[in-house]
A protein has these predicted regions:
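Acidic, PIN/NYN-like endoribonuclease modules and their adjacent C-terminal/linker elements
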Residues: 1-6, 104, 108-136
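Short, well-structured N-terminal submotif of metal-dependent ribonuclease cores
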Residues: 1-41, 51-64
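Histidine- and aromatic-rich ligand-binding microenvironments
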Residues: 10, 42, 95-97, 118, ...
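Conserved glycosyltransferase catalytic-site signature
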Residues: 11, 43, 76, 100-101
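A generic structural signal for short hydrophobic patches within well-formed alpha-helices
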Residues: 14, 46-49, 121-122
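Acidic catalytic patch
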Residues: 47-48, 70-91
Length: 136
């Protein structure tokens, strides 16, 4: 994928983009990334999305929709990096949910930025190599 940087889209963005009250900027950004084939996901984000499905039909629709974008694997060393990052942050008095740390480590490992609506990622970006996409 030379020249095409992927953007890992966090669950917080997917939920907002799919909402009936969706922020038009959020929805537009997601649609642009999808259109340019730059949207990416990973296992933990898929699990979070599917856990939040409202009906069996919604679950199946989400599974099909999310299956059509780039999938970032989570090798064993990424789990270890997440554990180390969590340990290091806690030693500094910073507590971040492990799911968010894992998502950040997956983005870092794949050299892609993260599109989010979650304050934990803003904190992680200020303390780690995580690159985040901002809404204007």
């Amino acid at each position: 994928m030379p020249g095409k940087e992927l953007v890992l889209i966090d669950t917080s963005v997917w939920i907002q983009a799919d909402s009936l009250k969706a922020n038009s900027e959020v929805k537009s950004k997601v649609l642009l990334l999808l259109d340019k084939d730059r949207a990416a996901t990973c296992g933990i984000i898929i699990a979070e999305l599917l856990c939040g499905a409202k009906t069996p039909t919604n679950y199946e629709e989400l599974k099909i929709d999310i299956g059509g974008i780039h999938y970032l694997n989570t090798p064993e060393d990424v789990w270890l990096k997440a554990a180390q990052m969590s340990f290091d942050l806690r030693k500094k008095g910073i507590s971040v949910p492990l799911t968010d740390i894992l998502i950040a480590c997956i983005a870092i490992d794949n050299n892609c930025s993260l599109l989010h609506l979650d304050k934990h990622f803003t904190c992680l970006a200020s303390k780690t190599d995580l690159k985040i996409e901002l809404f204007e």
